[in-house]
Regions:
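Accessory helical-bundle/CTD segments and flexible terminal tails appended to RecA-like ATPase motors
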Residues: 1-121
Length: 121
């Protein structure tokens, strides 16, 4: 529980990575559930830094709400829309980007989402 609370207080990906290293040093290689938690915390920190409003997963993929106040570079999203078929705009909501991870499994999908968020920053 101590680590969970500390993860929640991390604001930067580098802080999450430091905690991940500390946890691995103390307890050894973490199980899959902990790796998923760490991946989620990295995504939360990235999304917070970019001022992304929300990230949701549903049957269509990962939905990312990017309002005009965010720090996301719109030109990067447009460029990714042109070259990556996994990314589309929600026709019913002009602030929502739909991302369809190619990978299956929570850990792999989260890694893919993290890489995508880094590309739009």
């Amino acid at each position: 529980i101590e680590f969970y609370k500390r993860f929640e207080s991390c604001e930067l990906v580098s802080e999450v990575e430091e905690m991940e290293k500390e946890m691995t040093d103390r307890f050894g290689e973490p199980p899959a559930e902990v790796r998923v938690l760490v991946a989620l915390e990295k995504i939360r920190a990235l999304a917070s830094a970019l001022e992304i409003d929300e990230i949701l997963e549903d049957s269509r993929g990962v939905r990312i709400r990017i309002s005009g106040n965010s720090r996301v570079d719109p030109k990067k999203i447009v460029a990714l829309l042109k070259k990556d078929r996994r990314i589309s705009l929600d026709p019913t909501d002009n602030e929502m980007v739909l991302f369809k991870p190619a990978e299956k499994g929570d850990e792999k999908k989260l890694l893919e989402l993290k890489k995508w968020l880094q590309q739009i920053s």
